[in-house]
Swiss-Prot record:
Compartment annotation: Cytoplasm
Keyword set includes Cytoplasm: yes
Phosphoserine: modified positions: 254
Summary of the function given for this chain in its UniProt record: GTPase-activating protein (GAP) for CDC42 and less efficiently for RHO1. Negative regulator of the pheromone-response pathway through the STE20 protein kinase.
Name recorded for this polypeptide: GTPase-activating protein BEM3
Domain PH span(s) in chain numbering: 634-741
GO molecular function, one term: phosphatidylinositol-3-phosphate binding
Record keywords, A-Z: Cytoplasm, GTPase activation, Phosphoprotein
Length: 1128
């Protein structure tokens, strides 16, 4: 009874002392925090810590000097008052001798020398859990040297001794000294982990040499940041009000009172575990090095001594040791012992009748023992009975904080190379009451973060196996008791996460066989600058879309790396290259979309994944979901589109991503929620663009929208638009069909301009792109080629009839009735020529073109080819979203018979020659519009006109001349002004034509040619010559000459090339008058003819060599032209 009162009285006294110290420490921390904040927030430069420290030392020395001087003066005065007869010199000498003696005494009181026997003179708070029986203590010295058992700090209190304040302070100070010595350096820690016995023997062999302790710098450390063991962190928290209660309980319920038989069993088990330490430490050196510091304080020497003798030695030492200033400074670190113990979580076992629980006699209020530095190797799973861990092992941070230890034996089978696993689930029957009282230390240190990151995914999946094992043990289910503020410390249950995902899964891993995945778009943009991949999950049975989600390419690659690292033998296709995601070319976009579809299809074709991989895939498809907002009432269609504008001299023609929204008859294009383009469909024409492999713009699933800004003029805006799939294109065209206005058909252009057409228009001569609204449209997903079969009637008759209109080089018969005679003579063999043409182009889809003025005014018709050889099946037409485009009756068309394109501008060269032509130099056949322009320029000295082809004429007059040529096919430009004067003597001067107007008309005709100047088929041949001889212009000229003489270039194209380049040569020769040298001509005609400068320049420089059989111009006589026009 007296002992209990004494203990209670000592405990209350200690609590009061700790409360006072805690207040002192809080004030000190606030002061330090205030100093640090003031230093960081100062605008002006404040002195550094080293400068302040140096100044502080100087001031302290100065104050000490002043105090010493004052003390000496006081002694002198005192001695003079006592002995007035003594002289001043004698008194000063005596005072000086006294000061020297006191200084020597202070110096000898600093620190005792460090000797090999210092362990015996230090108060050790670490006592082993198992107490050795007397026979074992006497006869098992070898075992003591080779086996280090887990220890827990205890405070020895005898029955007849009370815990005084001074006694407690001495114990705390000694614990600090022991802790600091164990954390002396990482090198010593690692050595102690690998061989505790060896490091102990080295310490015993060290000479008894005195060590001088010096401090060059004081470091302000937060109490929470000390490198302490988990046990020390738990016991040193100043915020824990029950910290002294725990210390006292550690003594009252010390493991020294446990039965010797139980301790002997656990010691035997620890010996078997010690044999596997070396192998485990190699794999988990980080964890071992962190946790081992908590156990190196207890040495075999201290374990060999009896508890009673050890307490007596330490008690005697505490009496001899007092509090010096140095020890008080060390006491400042005491709060680090108390910081982390506040709010931990214990596991308390419910009623259990397991026989194994007899081993543990420790009270439930006892704090958990520290974890041992090692854990069990999976290689010993076959000998589980002989290697059962101690109860304290189950709470080891090495086991519980190591992610891979949550693997069970079953989950390890799913991996080809299973990682290191623990036998914890298989050893659940060995759990004792002590393991249920064990609480988990704080989170692992920073050094192990990289290892946890690699193993984190596996632990989150298989950790439920550990929970299930704990709950199914024979000892009963675990019961968690939370103390106040217990959320800051994790426990066994908090670390072992559930197998279920922490996020809701839309599809469970076992349901992968019921879904299929489809990549909808790689152009999706969701509030980010980078494009994402939009993916849909579709129910395999019903075919309906379940939900959508978007992923960046970075996240896609992360999943790919994860699967290939966990399942190396999984046959997965390669993801698209990074270059494919850095371009917006429609063909490249289509390619990467197909590759991604194949990739995800192969993933979901795998019958079964390991649990961790399956959960990772389920989390991948269940995050970043995209909720499709309800479409607005005025929105007919919306989606991502690729847009390209026609190229100019200063602009580019690259593809850009736009989000299109069709509202009523207006198509709005947005770039990052900013409206950039607005297209009015009621005054626009639409034509399809075929998918050709040699398209240099990479057009795929595209169409052209031409918006006419103002009727009567040639001003129009062209928009080249591509979708990601052909089905998506048909959906857009189906939505557009409701807003095409037939009244705008007269102003629709019949073909795309030559300067902004892509290679999709590079069909053979005589083929055309039909406009949307007067053409049939393919309903299948196959590449659709657009052509006009109605214009190919009888080439032989056409040529013979057109030759009747040829006159001499000075004039031409401009009678327009010749065209009607031509139509009458050519109608007989129309059907025969049509069948022949279809036989040659069986893979093409025919499109009928209605561009005549009369038929265009009637209606805009869309017809379907009913030929049996058409690859478009009836089923595909019915299923096609664009079938409403094709339901327009073609009965009105059949009554009028076949229609012939009668427009000059925009028609092929052969068509223009059939309609009207002239002989140039009695050799070359030229369309009438070209011949009339050349005639006017030569007769009116246009080749000497300054700025010819560079200065633009009146757009109104040019448009008027275009319409007249389209209707009359031939207009005498040399007499045009006279006809204007004859009609109206007071006509405005703006109606007259000039050199710049005629040159602008010629450029307009060349720009509207649906094919290249020398033919689309011959383009690659000329380009090959340039590429092979790009540094040798002479060889380029000779190569062009061979191509011209070989007859590969059709006569019609050759005639136009000869006439045009001869004109440019003569303009270049008069460059001193017209200021149009070779460089300026190349700048103007390269975009007009849609050919690069490197291909255009030889035709002008070496005209005589290429067309007239002359010699190439010598290298020194050539004019250097260094021009680069973008996208030409």
């Amino acid at each position: 009874m007296t002992d209990n009162l004494t203990t209670t009285h000592g405990g209350s006294t200690t609590l009061e002392l700790l409360a006072q110290y805690n207040d002192h420490r809080s004030k000190k921390d606030k002061s330090i925090e205030h100093i640090e904040k003031g230093t960081c927030s100062g605008k002006e430069r404040n002195p550094s810590y080293d400068e302040i420290f140096t100044e502080n030392i100087k001031l302290k020395l100065q104050v000490q000097e002043y105090e010493t001087e004052i003390e000496s003066l006081e002694k002198v005065i005192d001695m003079l008052q006592k002995n007035r007869e003594a002289s001043l010199e004698v008194v000063l000498e005596q005072v000086q001798n006294d000061s020297r003696d006191s200084y020597v005494n202070d110096q000898s009181f600093v620190l005792p020398p460090r000797s090999a026997e210092r362990k015996a003179h230090i108060k050790s708070l670490n006592l082993p859990i198992p107490t050795l029986s007397p026979p074992l203590q006497q006869g098992s010295d070898v075992a003591l040297e080779t086996s280090v058992t887990p220890t827990v700090p205890q405070i020895g209190v005898t029955s007849n001794t009370s815990i005084s304040r001074k006694h407690l302070q001495n114990m705390i100070l000694n614990d600090e000294i022991e802790a600091n010595s164990s954390f002396s350096s990482p090198k010593i820690i690692n050595r102690s982990v690998s061989s505790p016995t060896k490091i102990h023997s080295e310490q015993l062999a060290s000479p008894a040499a005195s060590v001088t302790y010096t401090t060059s710098r004081i470091t302000i450390k937060s109490p929470n940041k000390g490198s302490k063991s988990p046990l020390q962190e738990r016991l040193r928290s100043p915020q824990n009000p029950n910290r002294m209660t725990a210390v006292i309980n550690n003594h009252l319920h010390s493991p020294l009172k446990a039965s010797t038989s139980n301790n002997l069993d656990e010691l035997t088990e620890s010996k078997s575990q010690q044999l596997t330490n070396d192998a485990i430490q190699k794999n988990d050196r980080v964890y071992s090095s962190i946790t081992s510091s908590a156990y190196t304080t207890g040495t075999p020497t201290s374990a060999a001594k009896s508890p009673s003798s050890l307490l007596e030695v330490k008690e005697g030492e505490n009496k001899a040791l007092g509090f010096s200033p140095a020890s008080k400074e060390k006491l400042d670190d005491f709060t680090q012992l108390l910081d982390s113990s506040f709010g931990e979580e214990d596991l308390v076992n419910t009623d259990s009748k397991d026989p194994l629980s007899i081993k543990s006699t420790i009270n439930e209020s006892l704090p958990p023992p520290p974890a041992p530095p090692t854990f069990f190797s999976p290689t010993s799973s076959g000998n589980i009975k002989n290697s059962t861990p101690l109860s304290s092992h189950l709470a080891s941070p090495v086991i519980l904080n190591k992610k891979d230890d949550n693997f069970g034996a079953q989950s390890a089978k799913n991996l080809k190379k299973p990682v290191l696993t623990s036998s914890l689930p298989n050893l659940s029957t060995k759990l004792s009451t002590t393991s249920q009282n064990a609480s988990l230390p704080p989170n692992p240190p920073v050094e192990s973060s990289s290892k946890q990151k690699q193993l984190g995914e596996t632990a989150s999946i298989h950790s439920t196996n550990t929970l299930n094992t704990f709950s199914s043990t024979p000892q009963g289910s675990l019961k968690t008791l939370r103390r106040p503020h217990a959320s800051s410390v994790s426990t066994v249950k908090s670390v072992a996460q559930s197998l279920k995902s922490d996020i809701p899964l839309f599809v469970q891993p076992e349901d992968f066989g019921t879904i299929q995945i489809e990549v909808l778009s790689t152009l999706y943009r969701d509030n980010e600058d980078d494009l994402s991949i939009l993916i849909a999950i579709i129910d395999r049975k019903s075919g309906k879309e379940m939900f959508k989600f978007s992923k960046s390419i970075h996240k896609v690659r992360e999943l790919d790396v994860y699967m290939k690292s966990h399942v190396p033998d999984l046959p997965l296709p390669t993801l698209p290259d990074r270059q494919l995601f850095q371009t917006l070319s429609p063909t490249k976009v289509d390619t990467r979309k197909n590759i991604l579809n194949q990739y995800y299809t192969s993933i979901f074709s795998v019958p079964e994944f390991p649990k961790n991989v399956g959960l990772k895939i389920a989390q991948f498809i269940s995050t970043d979901t995209v909720m499709t907002p309800p479409m607005m009432d005025d929105n007919v269609k919306d989606g991502s589109l690729l847009l390209r504008r026609p190229k100019t001299l200063t602009g580019n023609s690259t593809w850009r991503v736009r989000y299109g929204i069709l509202r009523d008859d207006v198509l709005q294009l947005f770039d990052k929620n900013q409206l950039t383009e607005t297209i009015k469909l009621r005054q626009s024409s639409i034509e399809l663009i075929p998918n050709l492999p040699e398209d240099r713009f990479g057009t795929r699933n595209g169409f052209l929208i031409t918006e006419h800004k103002k009727s009567g003029l040639s001003t129009s805006t062209k928009y080249y638009i591509c979708t990601e799939t052909s089905k998506e294109r048909e959906l857009w065209l189906s939505a557009f069909s409701d807003y095409i206005d037939p009244s705008q058909s007269l102003s629709l252009s019949s073909s795309r301009n030559a300067n902004d057409t892509d290679s999709a228009s590079h069909l053979s001569a005589g083929t055309h792109h039909s406009k949307f609204g007067n053409a049939t449209i393919s309903a299948t997903d196959t590449p659709s080629y657009v052509t006009d079969l109605t214009q190919e009637y009888n080439n032989n008759n056409n040529i013979s009839n057109s030759s009747n209109n040829i006159a001499n080089s000075d004039g031409i018969d401009s009678n327009p009735s010749s065209h009607s005679n031509f139509l009458a003579s050519s109608s007989g063999n129309a059907e025969e020529e049509k069948d022949s043409r279809r036989a040659k182009m069986r893979s093409l889809f025919p499109f009928k073109k209605l561009t005549g003025p009369a038929s265009a005014m009637n209606h805009i018709g869309i017809t379907i080819s009913n030929d049996s050889d058409s690859p478009t099946s009836p089923d595909s037409i019915i299923k096609s979203p664009s079938k409403k485009l094709m339901e327009v009756s073609s009965s009105s068309n059949s009554s009028t018979g076949p229609h012939v394109s009668t427009a000059i501008f925009g028609s092929s060269l052969e068509t223009c020659l059939r309609l009207s032509s002239h002989k140039y130099q009695n050799v070359y056949d030229l369309p009438s519009v070209v011949y009339r322009c050349l005639e006017y320029l030569y007769k009116n000295r246009g080749i000497q006109e300054e700025g010819i082809f560079r200065l633009s004429g009146s757009s109104t007059v040019i448009k008027t001349l275009q319409e007249r040529f389209d209707k009359e096919y031939d207009v005498d430009l040399c007499r045009y002004n006279e006809s204007i004067e004859a009609k109206d003597d007071e006509a405005s001067p703006s109606l007259y034509i000039g050199v710049n107007t005629v040159s602008g008309l010629l450029k307009l005709y060349l720009r509207k040619l649906p094919h290249l100047l020398f033919g689309d088929e011959q383009f690659l041949s000329f380009k090959r010559v340039v590429d092979e001889n790009h540094n040798n212009p002479v060889q380029i000229s000779l190569g062009f000459k061979e191509l011209i003489e070989s007859g590969l270039v059709p006569h019609a194209n050759l005639s136009l090339m000869y006439a045009l380049f001869e004109l440019l040569v003569r303009i270049n020769e008069n460059s001193k008058f017209n200021k149009m040298n070779l460089r300026n001509l190349c700048i103007v005609f390269s975009p007009t003819l849609n050919i690069p400068i490197s291909m255009l320049q030889p035709f002008i420089t070496d005209f005589a060599c290429i067309f007239q059989g002359g010699e190439p111009v010598k290298e020194e006589e050539r004019e250097k032209v260094d021009i680069h026009i973008p996208q030409v």
